Amino acid sequence: MRALSFDVTIPRYLLARSLGRFTELATFGPLGGLRMTEVPEPALPAEDWVGLRVISAGICGTDLATLSFTAATSLEPFGSFPAVPGHEILARIEEVGPAVRDLEVGMRVVVDPLLSCRVRGHPDEEHCPSCRTGRPGTCEMAGEDGTTRVGARPLSRGLTIGYHADLPGGWGPFMVAHRSQIFPVPDELDDRSAVLVEPLSIGMHAALNAPPEPGQDVLVIGSGPIALGTIWALRASGFQGTLISQAKRDHEARLARALGAGEVVAPGDEARQALVDTGAQAYQPIVGEEVYAGGGFPLIYDCVGSPSSLSQSLRFAAPRGRIVMLGCAAMIPKLDLTFVWARELELRGFVGYGLERWRGREEHTFQITQELLVETRAPVRDLVTHVFPLDQFRTALSAAANHRRSEAVKVVLEP
């Protein structure tokens, strides 16, 4: 089948690192690691797997960082290449393994891309502590080959579909997934809403596990899909307090308000004024950025993960405040951590999704997200601003990477 394939080599890494700042030819172009090529159409590895025809798949910030070789190498041991990218997946079932009793050919589904111990083929008694508690995002076996057989060999190492040599992602026409990864899409959700279930579930996972306390003011930093999804998730899961969104551009501010932000501020003076309105007093050190005492935000969701956003989060947080990191922060040079101890702050990161406690039952984040999308009828489909056929992938990646110019929020590929 014709699909996009990404490979990691030292020459491509060096080329992208040296020229990527100047030209996309070295990242998303023909000199980069991504190309359209023939790859084997995947067969079902076992009886409890399903075959899928991809309807659409999103492009996320992690994809852009990986393809441009700007992502930290810390997670490199937990992937395998060459790989067909794409982990935000909407698909239709093409084939059902004989051990799968509750799915049918033709169903629209979304795919949890995380590769749990169950997907790797390990028996229940050998599942790692994370997978036993329904948190495959931190699977402790991701760096090892599995026992599931793909052809004549064991399943390669890897944490997720899209960064895995044996399991193609959504940037190709066909893929396979284990039954535990499959979630049927309600008829009430159109395709553009459904393809967002994966990124929306990241914000939902954080909102359910690090929710605001009654009466707390919340600041959400960022205006991409994760930040906007977090705003929606907070409101959809029941938060009714003050929710301030920090967004740079008018179209992002409109989306933030539509999804539940009570106030939207721009970075800089407007954000500073929102902080002062909490009772914060500004002080100017001999050198460096302005700092504050008193007031502050008791809960900040940093959905950017950049040096400037993390610095702001640390300065804007109230004493004993919580900072939730959803922005895939990696190598941050010269970050002043003084206020972590001087304000007794709590920093907590979240990755992916999994089993949650919800309305008196245990449910997967994807199920909760779809349930609440139907209930709230929120205009999340408006986050999908650009849709491209797969063969226009270079244009699509450029639009996603240059979102200030293109006004892209979520860019989607259709094989």
Q: What residues fall within each predicted segment?
A:
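Short N-terminal strand-loop motif that marks the start
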Residues: 1-88, 108, 169, 173, ...
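C-terminal hydrophobic helical "lid"/dimerization subdomain
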Residues: 3, 16, 288, 311-314, ...
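Glycine-rich beta-strand-centered segment in the early N-terminal region that forms part
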Residues: 40-57, 72-133, 137, 186-188
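NAD(P)H dinucleotide-binding glycine-rich loop of Rossmann-like/cofactor-binding domains
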Residues: 76-78, 117-221
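Adenosine-nucleotide cofactor-binding segment
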Residues: 217-223, 228, 235-308
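C-terminal substrate-binding/catalytic core of Rossmann-like NAD(P)-dependent dehydrogenases/reductases
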Residues: 273-290, 294, 333-385, 394
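ADP-ribose/adenylate-binding Rossmann-like module
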Residues: 315-333, 347
